[in-house]
Amino acid sequence: MTCPDKPGQLVNWFVCSLCAPRVCKLWSSRRPRTRRNLLLGTACAIYLGFLVSQVGRGSFQHGQATDRGPPNGHDIFKVPFSEIPLDGTLAPPELQGNGSTLQPNVVYITLRSKRSKPANIRGTVKPKRRKKYAVASAAPDQEVLVRPSLIQQEAARAADAEVPGYVQGYLTKVGERPWRVLRGPGVRTRGSNLQQPRARESNIRIYSESAPSWLSKEDIRRMRLLADSEVASILPISKSGTRLLVLEGSTSGSVPGCGPSPCGLLKQPLDMSEVFAFHLDRILGLNRTLPSVSRKLEFIQDGRPRPIILWDSSLASASNDSHSSVKITWGTYQRLLKQKCWLNGRVPRPEWDCTEIHHHEWSKMALFDFLLQIYNRLDTNCCGFRPRKEDACIQNGLRSNCEDQTSVTLAHIIQRKNDPRHLVFINNKGFFDRSEDNLNFKLLEGIREFPESAVSVLKSQHLRQKLLQSLFLDQVYWESQGGRQGIEKLIDVIERRARILITYINAHGARVLPMNE
């Protein structure tokens, strides 16, 4: 008798050889029938339990092998296992002819996917050492370089990007505050092989297919120039803290500059209303202000955003006392309004003492100044409202000159050299905290006509929507005012003043005319 080599036959042979003599001896011995039946039943129960455990084990392995099958589910791996016995004595039809037998776990093993090469176990592969760049401490009069990433360097090399160098020069020292230029992304210093790609996200965000219709392509280009261009140098131009920023770039096209490079006027954080004034001017269809954006600069220690206004070299030179290209007193201004100089192409008479400024320009300026309550042009002495202690007219002691208003000189009346008929609105610092019972109606004195394009926008219900859409483009300004909640409060003030202005126009019988001369 040979010993079987299969697991099922081996177990059966072991049980039969071990238990058969004992069962025969037990059956032939003289013992009580009850005890003999109990022992026989116990042995049968043990053997039956063993068979059940073998059946459960085979079913569990078959289920696991089916679940571990390949995800593509090709038919070549589908084998009819329902006809294979548990002990594996019967092979599939295609293997029975050659007399070979099939092990019950052979099919399960072949269903597993095989690796072509062993996997890399974490910790067994030596990591690549990254090259580190040590940033040397810069001297007080030297520039600070920012270490670029290796990925950005490779991207720049792959694109063969030629990064322009910086304008050489020294930073002008202003007072005791340390001003320094931090080299931002997209630049390369001479003598250094550290470079970064020029592409970066602009602070002027346009998520739609096109910009708002009231902003021209030239406006968007100039806004991005002011918001994203690197600063080459700084020149102080006034005691009030206004500085001239020389920006990197070219003055090609219609971008005016202060030499070979474009420039921008950097003002104080309290002048942030100039950004709002620029967008309001474009929405009303006046187009008399210079592009203005809000920006944070690295060389300013407080980190607060400040307005930057485009420097326009085409503006006519201004006098030192009134900051105007033409000297006009309040009395002369009222006479010019009555004469309606250059209206309908009519040449004024010499005795009228008309300037080269068109009559409609005064109406546009008065409407614009009233909405923002700008008093530094038509009411420099603050005679039309109750000023605060921090207002310039109180600080300079000009309030006492209100008794003789006819001799008061207007300020910030600016024209262009090549276009003296039209005004350019500069220094547009507005005031949103002035109550409705303290509005300066002196700004509207003598005005009998108002521009139709602006009045139609004020009468419509779209002023808020347009202001939100336009101011959203300037990300730094939007965030500096507290997001939409803060912008909504500013728009509330403008809407209330617009309703008051419409009431004033109707009450005084002023005409609303198209002013597209």
Curated annotation (Swiss-Prot):
<dbReference type="GO" id="GO:0000139">
    <property type="term" value="C:Golgi membrane"/>
</dbReference>
<dbReference type="InterPro" id="IPR029207">
    <property type="entry name" value="FAM198"/>
</dbReference>
<feature type="transmembrane region" description="Helical; Signal-anchor for type II membrane protein">
    <location>
        <begin position="37"/>
        <end position="56"/>
    </location>
</feature>
<protein>
    <recommendedName>
        <fullName>Golgi-associated kinase 1B</fullName>
    </recommendedName>
</protein>
<dbReference type="Pfam" id="PF15051">
    <property type="entry name" value="FAM198"/>
</dbReference>
<comment type="similarity">
    <text>Belongs to the GASK family.</text>
</comment>
<feature type="topological domain" description="Cytoplasmic">
    <location>
        <begin position="1"/>
        <end position="36"/>
    </location>
</feature>
<feature type="glycosylation site" description="N-linked (GlcNAc...) asparagine">
    <location>
        <position position="287"/>
    </location>
</feature>
<feature type="glycosylation site" description="N-linked (GlcNAc...) asparagine">
    <location>
        <position position="98"/>
    </location>
</feature>
<keyword id="KW-0812">Transmembrane</keyword>
<feature type="topological domain" description="Extracellular">
    <location>
        <begin position="57"/>
        <end position="517"/>
    </location>
</feature>
<keyword id="KW-0472">Membrane</keyword>
<keyword id="KW-0333">Golgi apparatus</keyword>
<keyword id="KW-0735">Signal-anchor</keyword>
<keyword id="KW-0325">Glycoprotein</keyword>
<keyword id="KW-1133">Transmembrane helix</keyword>
